[in-house]
């Protein structure tokens, strides 16, 4: 009999309650200050990062091999036979490869590792769907086969108050930097086919960028039924405004407003508003 574990990283931006409810195993990114470090999700909250930005902008790093091994030891002791790992885009983080190197050395599990080529709650929504399939009793092979379909149905878009934090983290990629700030152009950011950040649209000023974000959501809803999560980093009021502007669409299934996690907050900075869209599967 298959006993399947789902493992992911903390960039999925799931809550502690969701992690418990879906029996997920999390590899936390590290949030590092000059004199201290924290495990994302478990040891630090986004508000802690934002309130300290004027003193110090932290960095993030990968979960350690020792921590990954401790998670695997626990799963082995609990009798898990199969492992499905669903991780942040390998173009944005070394987490996928770090996990792969450790898991490949273990003979206890039959495993499958999936590079989501996405980040944040869009990743989290893929993880939740996979965990639901585990609860439903689907087989290891069925879930693996479904992952590409779930990923194809899932997308995310973001707009930031400033690109400063994305630049500091070295993850700005194809996203236009200095010119955008100088001209008050706000890029709408997504990921390309390789899972790297890219600009898919620009708007002049904050108000127009939020309108553009809403119009992108409506375009997806026009194509079919979707679950939508509006994401924010210390911008809940604006996130609710975006949700209000799309809430009457007949193809909107479930909708919610969610806060991004601490590690995401390090790179997005305060004021990020985004969206996770998942087509009906």
Curated annotation (Swiss-Prot):
SUPFAM superfamilies: DAK1/DegV-like. Hexadecanoate binds at residues 60, 93. This is DegV domain-containing protein CPE2509. It holds the Pfam family DegV. PROSITE patterns: DEGV. It comes from Clostridium perfringens (strain 13 / Type A). The keyword Nuclease does not apply. It comes from the Bacteria. InterPro entries: DegV, DegV_C, DegV_domain_contain. Keywords: Lipid-binding. May bind long-chain fatty acids, such as palmitate, and may play a role in lipid transport or fatty acid metabolism. One of its GO terms (molecular function) is lipid binding. Residues 4-279 form the DegV domain. PANTHER family: DEGV DOMAIN-CONTAINING PROTEIN DR_1986-RELATED, DEGV DOMAIN-CONTAINING PROTEIN YITS.
